[in-house]
């Protein structure tokens, strides 16, 4: 019995670690910087990538942390569905503002298309979240792989197992059901691929 309890504890610890490492804000940092550097070179790409991250991830996540600190949100993953729509709407407005800034900075088409895909993904996720709890972690993971595969290299598809790992983690810690994770992954990859194939 103690061995089974220990195994369960280990799985949950691993699931929480995966949840943090594969959180949307981390993935936004990764994908914006990779796409920006790939399309604009090291120096300019890094600068533009940081600008894109600020509007797409940094600012919204900062507001989430403030909300948690003030007791307005349960946690930084916003586990309660009813708390998500307002934050996601604010994030959507922030990303749209980022698009305007990137256009003004004459950002590369690939980076601009990436942020357009983020806007579309957020809009769809917000619509679903208004009545059902979708896995934003799974959507972000699948969307990240799709974006990197289309905008940088198909070799990035080799990271697809990380989407499965992320889904497992969210189910293991009981933040989502398998269906919520599966729908999140489908929405994330589908919206990203659809938008990029039209815009990029």
Please place each PLM-identified region on the residue numbering.
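Short, Lys/Arg-rich, polar N-terminal cytosolic tail immediately upstream
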Residues: 1-15
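Juxtamembrane helix-capping/reentrant segments at transmembrane boundaries
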Residues: 15, 74-91
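Core segments of transmembrane alpha-helices
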Residues: 27-29, 89-100, 139-142, 187-188
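Short, hydrophobic transmembrane alpha-helix segments
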Residues: 35-47
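Alpha-helical transmembrane segments
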Residues: 44-59, 117, 147
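Transmembrane alpha-helix boundary signature
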Residues: 66-73, 99-112
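Membrane-embedded catalytic cores of phosphoryl/pyrophosphoryl-handling enzymes
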Residues: 108-200
């Amino acid at each position: 019995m103690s061995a089974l309890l220990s195994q369960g504890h280990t799985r949950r610890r691993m699931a929480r670690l995966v949840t943090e490492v594969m959180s949307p804000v981390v993935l936004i940092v990764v994908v914006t910087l990779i796409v920006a550097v790939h399309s604009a070179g090291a120096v300019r790409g890094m600068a533009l990538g940081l600008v894109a991250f600020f509007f797409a991830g940094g600012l919204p996540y900062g507001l989430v942390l403030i909300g948690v600190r003030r007791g307005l949100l349960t946690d930084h993953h916003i586990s309660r569905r009813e708390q998500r729509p307002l934050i996601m709407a604010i994030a959507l407005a922030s990303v749209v503002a980022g698009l305007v800034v990137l256009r003004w900075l004459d950002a590369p088409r690939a980076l601009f298309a990436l942020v357009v895909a983020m806007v579309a993904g957020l809009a769809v996720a917000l619509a679903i979240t208004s009545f059902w709890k979708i896995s934003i972690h799974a959507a972000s993971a699948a969307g990240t792989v799709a974006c990197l595969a289309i905008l940088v290299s198909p070799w990035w598809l080799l990271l697809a197992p990380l989407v499965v790992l992320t889904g497992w983690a969210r189910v293991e810690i009981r933040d989502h059901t398998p269906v919520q994770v599966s729908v999140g992954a489908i929405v994330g990859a589908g919206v990203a691929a659809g938008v990029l194939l039209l815009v990029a």
